[in-house]
Amino acid sequence: MEENRPVEQTRLISKPKIVVTRKLPEPIETRMMELFDARLNLEDIPLTRDELLMAVQTAEILIPTVTDNIDSEIINSAGSQLRMIANFGVGVDHINLSSAALKDIIVTNTPDVLTQDTADLTMALILMTPRRMGEGERIVRNSEWTGWTPTHLMGHRINGKRLGIIGMGRIGTAVAERARGFGLTVHYHNRNRVTDEIESKLEATYWDSLDQMLAHMDIVVITCPSTPATFHLLSERRLQLLQPNCFIVNTSRGNIIDEKALLTMLESGAIAGAGLDVFENEPIIDPKFLKMENVVILPHLGSATIEGRIAMGECVIVNAKSFVDGHKPPNRVLATLL
């Protein structure tokens, strides 16, 4: 196969070999077996680093997930047959895009199809955290509920509160739409300001300064992607700008928040609480989080619906099949965009 050919002219042989690093929904695996020479992970045990290194020696298309660290070493060790990394998921912070570009390896992701599910979960955390639902559920499960009292587990009203969204892309916009239905006032900080039409529809206020927005919000939600520019975007300094009655919700990536600084703020009562679906070193979670009653914690469930995961798999197949057929994949990710 010639190197450096444009995507439109690249055509792999029939039944190209693909390696899928995790178990996917059954309908997706069945379709992949029909279209490709597919090596599946039926036991759903994460591949070791050595197994990943072996996979890129034989696969023409690698289909990884967020749990796979496809760094420069993995990519540089790949054989010349590896032409595509078709990621199962929208986030690609676990893939070294620059190294892939240098080897003319196409990278794709699965945007759009998980927007609504992730926004739903984000809205759930926005509701659960101030209303202390996690605490209440634990009390009932542990048979500790002694009955209703006027002052038991009093949380904070959602209606009328100021919601600050960091990252007004697809998911951030979908969260804003839901938040309006609960009477929250929408504020946002984004790399680029959204259109007047979207701002008007959402009655959203744009803040050019993230620092200033943080200092005025009741709830802060992180929906921006993880990139080198957003690593520890909520640093210790920025976390200290938050009001004591502020709640933080993160359904993006754990490394966008300085987790140690967040723990310190939560322990001291400098902020009111947090709703977290992602963690900096997941699945390893700092045990301090587990003991905090003012923290709602979930195991990275953002897009975890049957419909969403099947749609993500279908998107992977479309990307891979387009490439195999010599066409430009619809969801190509370029290193320059990040």
Q: Which residues are covered by each model-predicted region?
A:
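Phosphate/diphosphate ligand-binding glycine-rich loop within oxidoreductases
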Residues: 59-141, 155
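N-terminal glycine-/charge-rich "phosphate-binding" loop or analogous flexible N-terminal tail
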Residues: 1-59, 183, 324
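Short, well-ordered coil/turn residues at beta-beta hairpins
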Residues: 21, 65, 88, 223-226, ...
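C-terminal helix-to-coil terminal segments
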Residues: 2-16, 108-121, 148, 154, ...
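Rossmann-like adenosine-cofactor binding region
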Residues: 70-73, 192-288
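Hydrophobic/small residue at the entry helix of a nucleotide-binding pocket
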Residues: 171
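Conserved N-terminal Rossmann-fold NAD(P)-binding element of oxidoreductases
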Residues: 21, 164-166
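Phosphate-binding beta-alpha-beta segment of Rossmann-like dinucleotide-binding domains, i.e.
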Residues: 111-162, 174-177, 181, 188-191, ...
